[in-house]
């Protein structure tokens, strides 16, 4: 099992190009199932989850290739509209094939999902919405079995109000709705930039969607969609991770290929912490000297502070002047990094969904274990500032969501290298 060996060595300097967003690329790849025509994507990150999704689509009969950051997909000949457990268990986004398969082929069999162990993240909102659109769904032996009602040729439009804001639920129902008969209204829809990117791609394919970027999406179903070419948006969480790394280690780094507008909540908190930020249309320059100030924050749905940045920003508070409260409202069980950060000398106490962080002047290197994707990133940042060497174990979590993180950090002066396991 691979590990990362990191030596804390002071400020970072240079440029980093931000990769495409995994959380946009995966649903967009699933959208290829909606059309028999070819489909080309650019700026796709080179990640394990992308490779897993490609493998899943190929298993269904999709012709798919990846060349660097370009992916081509052709779903003209689907012979197995099924997502088996052995692939779905490693990646929750596999559930996103359910809506497209049901909409285009009228039936689907999808294993209940796996992925990071950071809470239940149920799929009941997906199922409830599809049932309102006329799907008959049963769950047997760990699989979601979905089909159209007897005699129905298509899903039908419906007004769907989800009980909570759900990103993958919005994406699944949106992809189902674009081929449904009639009008579908998605109330309480997720507004994340990745959802907007998917919606913009669907419009290129011929979908009729109003309200893109709002919490109310109105979809007029069409009979067929065409192929498309699309460039995936920048990964705002990767960008935020590098911003926190520079804020912690100090230095002067420019991030390229990322529009600042998708990161407003994180940028506001970084300014509160004392970070100097300058920016243009698709770049952000981050400058930091001295210790950050402790900043309290609360995670919530976009456009508020993202749960996927909670661990990284908590790490910044670990070495800050003062104390701060971190409140996690999206997922239960998302403080698994706390124990590992405390092993490095951090002072964090948790109670329920809140962590009280008191900043310390210095962390000390140690062997730590990654428990999920974003927890892994917080441990890498900790290693950049800790005295001595830090060994981060189980970094397969990191490889699921970060494209060459050690190479990008090395290029700006970090002492970090992968040890093959």
From Swiss-Prot:
Pathway: Cell wall biogenesis; peptidoglycan biosynthesis. It is found in: Cytoplasm. The modification 2-(S-cysteinyl)pyruvic acid O-phosphothioketal is found at residue 116. GO terms for biological process: cell division; cell wall organization; peptidoglycan biosynthetic process; regulation of cell shape; UDP-N-acetylgalactosamine biosynthetic process. GO terms for molecular function: UDP-N-acetylglucosamine 1-carboxyvinyltransferase activity. UDP-N-acetyl-alpha-D-glucosamine binds at residues 92, 121-125, 308, 330. It comes from the Bacteria. The active site is at residue 116. It is an enzyme of class 2 (transferase). It catalyses: phosphoenolpyruvate + UDP-N-acetyl-alpha-D-glucosamine = UDP-N-acetyl-3-O-(1-carboxyvinyl)-alpha-D-glucosamine + phosphate. SUPFAM superfamilies: EPT/RTPC-like. Its EC number is 2.5.1.7. Pfam families: EPSP_synthase (PF00275). GO terms for cellular component: cytoplasm. InterPro entries: Enolpyruvate_Tfrase_dom, Enolpyruvate_Tfrase_sf, MurA_subfamily, RNA3'P_cycl/enolpyr_Trfase_a/b, UDP_GlcNAc_COvinyl_MurA. Keywords: Cell cycle, Cell division, Cell shape, Cell wall biogenesis/degradation, Cytoplasm, Peptidoglycan synthesis, Pyruvate, Transferase. Belongs to the EPSP synthase family. MurA subfamily. Cell wall formation. Adds enolpyruvyl to UDP-N-acetylglucosamine. This is UDP-N-acetylglucosamine 1-carboxyvinyltransferase. It comes from Ralstonia nicotianae (strain ATCC BAA-1114 / GMI1000).
